[in-house]
Amino acid sequence: MFDWLLEPLQFEFMQNALLTALIVSIICALLSCYLVLKGWSLMGDAISHAVLPGIVLAYLAGIPLAIGAFFSGIFCSLGVGYLKENSRIKEDTAMGIVFSGMFAIGLVMFTKIQTEEHLTHILFGNVLGVSHQELIQSAVISAIIFCLIVFKRKDFLLYCFDPSHARVAGLSPKILHYGLLILLALTIVSTMQVVGVILVVAMLIAPGITALTLTKSFDKMLWVAIASSIASSLIGVILSYHFDASTGACIILLQAAFFVIALAYSKIRIR
């Protein structure tokens, strides 16, 4: 059994993959708890699709894809905020049209590019092909996100529960709103190499809802989310190696399985 688990570690590309999955899983789990409490499941899905045009433009310009993805996500988030504040359109409606339009633009640009192999990995993930440089990039981005979440943990928590209460407490809901959006965009940039922009929303939601099903306090929710996210990511990478399956799909399937188990356990515990 141990030989089966340790066999992938003899290869450098698997070491990079496991480290990247570990780093990204922790950040996704932390942010997932806030997104679930805030009800931003659609926001994570929307931004993950909206980064595609930025990725294509960055590829054409010869700059790091992460830069294009980040600014594309932020641009669309600001666009949704502008529509919400300056029209009668509700936020979820604005997200639907803006981010779907951006993804469509990205797909059109994507199909016109001659060399598509690397960009295909961005769509569906390719953690087994992560280079040492990409590992460092994910680690740096994740460290920034981790520090910001820990530093503003209570402020974000208060904002997610009650923006009006946050305003009374002397905080700026608008700053916290866009701050959370920036963290979300950064997390998507860091995660897209693992599962791709299409499946990244699952990593941003599944750990949080699994933990919410099992716990009643936010601190416990964070720990359970981190544990389930790490377990699904590491086991998913190992399973994908042995069964020659899509790594991103294996990770997401395990997270879905953990949620089903958690939901069943919570129902049994209530009885």
From Swiss-Prot:
Localization annotation = Cell inner membrane
Superkingdom of origin: Bacteria
Q: Which InterPro entries match?
A: ABC_BtuC-like, ABC_TroCD
Classification via Gene3D superfamilies? ABC transporter involved in vitamin B12 uptake, BtuC
Q: What is its main location?
A: membrane
Q: Which keywords, in A-to-Z order, does the entry hold?
A: Cell inner membrane, Cell membrane, Ion transport, Iron, Iron transport, Membrane, Transmembrane, Transmembrane helix, Transport
Q: What topology does the record note for this protein and the membrane?
A: Multi-pass membrane protein
An example GO BP is: iron ion transport
**Residue ranges crossing the lipid bilayer per the database entry:** 17-37, 55-75, 93-113, 131-151, 168-188, 194-214, 221-241, 245-265
Q: What's in the GO CC field?
A: ATP-binding cassette (ABC) transporter complex; plasma membrane
Q: SUPFAM superfamilies, from UniProt?
A: ABC transporter involved in vitamin B12 uptake, BtuC
Function recorded in the entry: Part of an ATP-driven transport system HI_0359/HI_0360/HI_0361/HI_0362 for iron.
Similarity-based family: Belongs to the ABC-3 integral membrane protein family.
What name does UniProt use for this protein?
Probable iron transport system membrane protein HI_0359
The record lists the organism as: Haemophilus influenzae (strain ATCC 51907 / DSM 11121 / KW20 / Rd)
Q: What is the lineage of its organism?
A: Bacteria, Pseudomonadati, Pseudomonadota, Gammaproteobacteria, Pasteurellales
